[in-house]
């Protein structure tokens, strides 16, 4: 699949951090799963977890030999977004740069559409 057809991007910085974390866990089957749940101060919130499974209907995006997984329900809120990683004074975290979000909370962990 070419990048032009992928509805969600996985940044090099995020992929490299995932690669490091997988190496630390010594489990090459791990993949980063991004998902959306109800809650947070803006209505929806992003979640990230490591998962060994890819479920029916999940989309996978690969970068630098690691895989990002997203379920179809979450994907509809993430189309056009970029999963990225940052380290700063507020700590380190994965985040989504989401063009569909009409409002976001101050920390960027929740959003509304």
UniProtKB/Swiss-Prot annotation:
GO molecular function, one term: 4 iron, 4 sulfur cluster binding
Signal peptide from the UniProt entry: none
Record bears the keyword Metal-binding: yes
InterPro entries: FeS_biogenesis (IPR000361), FeS_cluster_insertion (IPR016092), FeS_cluster_insertion_CS (IPR017870), FeS_cluster_insertion_RrpA (IPR023063), HesB-like_dom_sf (IPR035903)
Gene Ontology CC annotation, any one: cytosol
Cofactor note: Binds 1 iron-sulfur cluster per subunit.
Named cofactor requirement(s): iron-sulfur cluster
Keywords, in A-Z order: Iron, Iron-sulfur, Metal-binding
Swiss-Prot/TrEMBL GO biological process terms: iron-sulfur cluster assembly
Superkingdom in the source lineage: Bacteria
Residue positions binding iron-sulfur cluster: 41, 105, 107
Positions of transmembrane segments: none
Pfam family, one: Fe-S_biosyn
Quaternary structure, from the entry: Homodimer.
NCBIfam families: iron-sulfur cluster assembly accessory protein, PRK13623.1
HAMAP family assigned: Fe_S_insert_ErpA
Family: Belongs to the HesB/IscA family.
Function according to Swiss-Prot or TrEMBL: Required for insertion of 4Fe-4S clusters for at least IspG.
Name of the protein described by the UniProt record: Iron-sulfur cluster insertion protein ErpA
